[in-house]
């Protein structure tokens, strides 16, 4: 086991003392970086990049090489690898985003879906995790991730992205038995997939419930949170002599933090619509918090970025249990220098809140 040179991120998730607030950024390996665009061009297309462990490793490390302040790496992959491995036929349409050649519309469709084996069916992801861990050589921890069952189900039922989730919600209310069967199979798949990533070397994992906030409060409890709890219950929580923290992120889930805090994850991700000080008052005794700057702040000048970082740090207050991040992923049009100003500000301005 390679010793971690920087374990600030893991310590904050476990609410252990840190010198400064750790920072990383969702989609930190992405289109805003010219070096990422060059590697993607070399790969040919997005899925070819995801499925090449060496190139996935290359783009995972690019932001760390550019920004020495980053306290974690996140596996470069896509949340839709699981449905693709179930035989749904993932492809990307220019300007349309992800699409599936097969759509799930009945209980018979769901019963025919396999639960993918991480090494057999998603070996390229496990190989990428192993390659990244080797190349990181203990520089920072590596985060693995998956989409949540509800979020994956929406893509599988809709056949791709959706603005209104018409088919998914129709199935949820018209045929809850079918939706529960799909979510249960996805929960098994996600548990197996994340455990595979942990075995391969992921030192923390995040569940992205990107579309949980589209649900009513009652439907969120029944059709999203229930299945994330099943996953958390089934995850490997100790590996290589260390706790493997779990981060739960429901975009639009700010009203439900108390319920989310009961699931057993070490941390909750917050989107930018939450006040982090209020969130800490509500659930900070039970969980660490990750977030939550509006990604659009990165379009502003470095002084404005710094001011917003200062505001969020002050809102959280003194002590550990905060991982600074955006409230969602960085957008492709952001100037890379502005991301650098963000990371620098977090470390420079947060020292006063620790020690």
From Swiss-Prot:
Belongs to the uroporphyrinogen decarboxylase family. Catalyzes the decarboxylation of four acetate groups of uroporphyrinogen-III to yield coproporphyrinogen-III. Substrate binds at residues 27-31, 78, 155, 210, 328. Its EC number is 4.1.1.37. This is Uroporphyrinogen decarboxylase. Keywords: Cytoplasm, Decarboxylase, Lyase, Porphyrin biosynthesis. PANTHER family: METHYLTETRAHYDROFOLATE:HOMOCYSTEINE METHYLTRANSFERASE RELATED, UROPORPHYRINOGEN DECARBOXYLASE.
